């Protein structure tokens, strides 16, 4: 093949040979120039999207922190309510409570606790469960132990702490929205002798805690991953589970927010990570920028083709 090209070149007239040599020497700097220009354009596209994803993650960090504080503060308020603790302790120890005491507790304390929850739009519910069924239920605040056992998290060996993505089963499935997913902080309530007298479930919806997991934004996807490796989010992730695990393994825990560019599975992604230590997990957001990067490649190819055509015409 090389010999045939050599003979074909030697058979050409001198002016054609001269033109071909000029075209060849001009193609090299044009190719280098195109490579540099469009490489810089590609890096600019990547940098812009990395800045966007970092900004989005910073907003998510502030929003999640606000919601965690809201749940923690509400839980502490319930834990410091002496009247509530007194009723839980009475139920735990079998101490009789008169009807008048129950009515006073309901009108003065339960109503104020209910208003506290109702006036906080971030919260879904705050429920207090006794350690047995020897308590007069006062909805939507105080419940018996048997009611708590209907919740999914109550079946765990250790359910204290954060529980994610469960349905509210405290009442009949006919009366509760089974499509509503809940996240809650479950906290033990102990008396002065550190004996258990109850449990507090402070809950909000998953969509409220992690709105990015449920937003329908083109070419963007998010999930929350616990330290146990459990994924919560849209199940239609735009890439394989293996790639997602590789992305998580690449996370730099030294930084609060880490944003990286990833090329995998013939596609281009910008991945932003954030460790949420209070929840014992990590928030991950992915943007598919394949189309934007390929536009740069297409422009580069068109530029090179046009320049070559111009050289041939001029020659």
Question: Could you say what each language-model-derived stretch is?
Answer:
Residues 1-43, 47, 51, 308, ...:
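Extreme N-terminal signal-anchor transmembrane helix of membrane signaling/transducer proteins, especially
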Residues 51-159:
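Extracytoplasmic/periplasmic sensory segments of membrane signal-transduction proteins
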Residues 99-113, 139-175, 219, 234-261:
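Extracytoplasmic/periplasmic sensor domains and loops in membrane signaling proteins
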Residues 106-118, 193-233:
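Solvent-exposed, extracytoplasmic
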Residues 175-200, 216-218, 263-282, 290-291:
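Extracytoplasmic
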Residues 208-283:
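Intrinsic low-complexity, intrinsically disordered coil/linker regions enriched in small/polar
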Residues 282-315:
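Cytoplasm-proximal transmembrane signaling helix
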């Amino acid at each position: 093949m090389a010999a045939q090209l050599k003979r074909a070149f030697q058979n050409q007239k001198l002016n054609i040979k001269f033109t071909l040599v000029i075209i060849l020497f001009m193609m090299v700097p044009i190719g280098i120039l195109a490579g540099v220009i469009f490489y810089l354009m590609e890096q600019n596209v990547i940098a812009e999207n990395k800045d966007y994803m970092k900004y989005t993650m910073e907003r998510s960090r502030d929003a999640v922190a606000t919601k965690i504080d809201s749940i923690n503060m509400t839980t502490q308020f319930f834990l410091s309510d002496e009247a509530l603790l007194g009723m839980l302790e009475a139920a735990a120890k079998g101490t009789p409570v008169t009807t008048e005491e129950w009515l006073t507790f309901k009108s003065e304390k339960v109503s104020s606790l209910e208003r506290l929850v109702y006036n906080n739009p971030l919260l879904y519910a705050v429920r207090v469960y006794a350690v047995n069924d020897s308590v007069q239920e006062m909805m939507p605040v105080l419940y018996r132990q048997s009611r708590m056992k209907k919740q999914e998290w109550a079946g765990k060996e250790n359910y204290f702490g954060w529980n994610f993505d469960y349905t509210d089963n405290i009442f009949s499935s006919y009366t509760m929205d089974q499509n509503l997913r809940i996240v809650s902080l479950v906290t033990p309530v102990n008396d002065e002798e550190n004996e258990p007298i109850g449990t507090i479930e402070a809950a909000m919806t998953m969509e409220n805690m992690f709105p990015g997991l449920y937003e329908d934004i083109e070419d963007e996807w998010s999930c929350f991953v616990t330290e146990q490796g459990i994924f919560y989010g849209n199940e239609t992730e735009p890439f394989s589970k293996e790639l997602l695990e590789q992305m998580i393994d690449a996370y730099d825990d030294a930084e609060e927010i880490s944003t990286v560019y990833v090329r995998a599975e013939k596609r281009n992604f910008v991945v932003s990570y954030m460790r949420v230590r209070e929840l014992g997990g990590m928030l991950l957001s992915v943007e598919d920028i394949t189309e934007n990067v390929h536009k740069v490649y297409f422009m580069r190819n068109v530029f090179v083709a046009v320049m070559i055509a111009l050289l041939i015409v001029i020659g």
